[in-house]
UniProtKB/Swiss-Prot annotation:
It is found in: Secreted; Cell projection, Neuron projection. Disruption phenotype: Significant reduction in the sneezing response to capsaicin at both low and high doses but does not affect pain-related nose wiping behavior or apnea induced by capsaicin. Abolishes the sneezing response to histamine, seratonin and the neuropeptide Npff. Abolishes sneezing response to mast cell-dependent allergy. It holds the Pfam family Bombesin. Belongs to the bombesin/neuromedin-B/ranatensin family. The keyword Secreted applies. The modification Methionine amide is found at residue 56. GO terms for cellular component: extracellular space; neuron projection. Induction: Up-regulated in lung tissue in response to infection with influenza A virus. Keywords: Amidation, Cell projection, Cleavage on pair of basic residues, Immunity, Innate immunity, Secreted, Signal. It comes from Mus musculus. It comes from the Eukaryota. Stimulates smooth muscle contraction. Induces sighing by acting directly on the pre-Botzinger complex, a cluster of several thousand neurons in the ventrolateral medulla responsible for inspiration during respiratory activity. Contributes to the induction of sneezing following exposure to chemical irritants or allergens which causes release of NMB by nasal sensory neurons and activation of NMBR-expressing neurons in the sneeze-evoking region of the brainstem. These in turn activate neurons of the caudal ventral respiratory group, giving rise to the sneeze reflex. The lineage of its organism: Eukaryota, Metazoa, Chordata, Craniata, Vertebrata. The keyword Signal applies. This is Neuromedin-B.
């Protein structure tokens, strides 16, 4: 009977040691390396600086494309109103050409006076 009690204590002790060892093992992987080995490694804290200044000051050799000329947004409120009225007229003329219904909301009165003579032509 004492032999079974002694072996159970031994088994419990081994099990406890195994659990303790498995819990401590992952922490040992993060220990720092000795200084002699770490000093041999060259560390660049900012990363690779190989092509840092390669494109600094470079100018484009191609002229700006003509499609970008004149696409700047209108600057003044008058220019914006003119652009909006042109866009609205173009949309309405497309709807008329496609035979679409004008069942949407009516344009504001200020634009209606501009559009009525153009649509009656």
């Amino acid at each position: 009977m004492t032999r079974q009690a002694g072996s159970s204590w031994l088994l419990r002790g081994l099990l406890l040691f195994a659990l303790f060892a498995s819990g401590v093992a992952p922490f040992n992987w993060d220990l720092p390396e000795p200084r002699s080995r770490a000093s041999k490694i060259r560390v660049h804290p900012r990363g690779n600086l190989w092509a840092t200044g390669h494109f600094m000051g470079k100018k484009s050799l191609e002229p700006p494309s003509l499609s970008l000329v004149g696409t700047a947004p209108p600057n003044t409120p008058r220019d914006q109103r003119l652009q909006l009225s042109h866009d609205l007229l173009r949309i309405l003329l497309r709807k008329k050409a496609l035979g679409m219904n004008f069942s949407g909301p009516a344009p504001p009165i200020q634009y209606r006076r501009l559009l009525e003579p153009l649509l009656q032509k």
